[in-house]
Amino acid sequence: MIQSQINRNIRLDLADAILLSKAKKDLSFAEIADGTGLAEAFVTAALLGQQALPADAARLVGAKLDLDEDAILLLQMIPLRGCIDDRIPTDPTMHRFYEMLQVYGTTLKALVHEKFGDGIISAINFKLDVKKVADPEGGERAVITLDGKYLPTKPF
């Protein structure tokens, strides 16, 4: 039976335990996701408390991280999503994304509406990918792909 969570703390505590186990075992998120049939970003989101894993994926991930049965069950429960504290993020990486939306949010909105009409880009029917590429000017660049289904607003 599908279960839902109403308290974010239990999944945040599990995320802390998962990150500790990941570090002790020197595993990457890609290594943990390998064999699940799911995207690295989706499995990572589940491990950090923002998605639910199918039972088979939860068991596979649980075995890699030496999680107990309760933790494996928690990974399958529908979490309280988007539950980062209701404030401007202070973590430097997360803050840069916040800044990007502050600067380019209205641009993204205008371009989406111009190209698609009134509606939203789904975060449910969604894919996320992060790649590291060489910068021709030296160093490295992050290529982040947000791939969401467009959902038009429907008058009623």
UniProtKB/Swiss-Prot annotation:
InterPro entries for the chain = Cyanase (IPR008076), Cyanate_lyase_C (IPR003712), Cyanate_lyase_C_sf (IPR036581), CYNS_N (IPR048564), Lambda_DNA-bd_dom_sf (IPR010982)
Q: Which residues form a coiled coil?
A: none
**Signal peptide start-end:** none
Enzyme superclass (EC):
lyase
Which SUPFAM superfamilies does the entry mention? Cyanase C-terminal domain, lambda repressor-like DNA-binding domains
Q: Which Pfam families match?
A: Cyanate_lyase, CYNS_N
Q: Which GO terms describe its biological process?
A: cyanate metabolic process
- Source organism superkingdom: Bacteria
Its UniProt entry gives the catalysed reaction(s) as:
cyanate + hydrogencarbonate + 3 H(+) = NH4(+) + 2 CO2
What's in the keyword line of the UniProt record?
Answer: Lyase
The record places the active site at 96, 99, 122
Q: What is its EC number?
A: 4.2.1.104
Write down the CDD domains for this protein, in alphabetical order. Answer: Cyanase_C
Q: Which family does it belong to?
A: Belongs to the cyanase family.
> What functional role does this protein have?
Catalyzes the reaction of cyanate with bicarbonate to produce ammonia and carbon dioxide.
Q: Which HAMAP family match?
A: Cyanate_hydrat
Q: What is this protein called?
A: Cyanate hydratase
- State the organism of origin: Escherichia coli O9:H4 (strain HS)
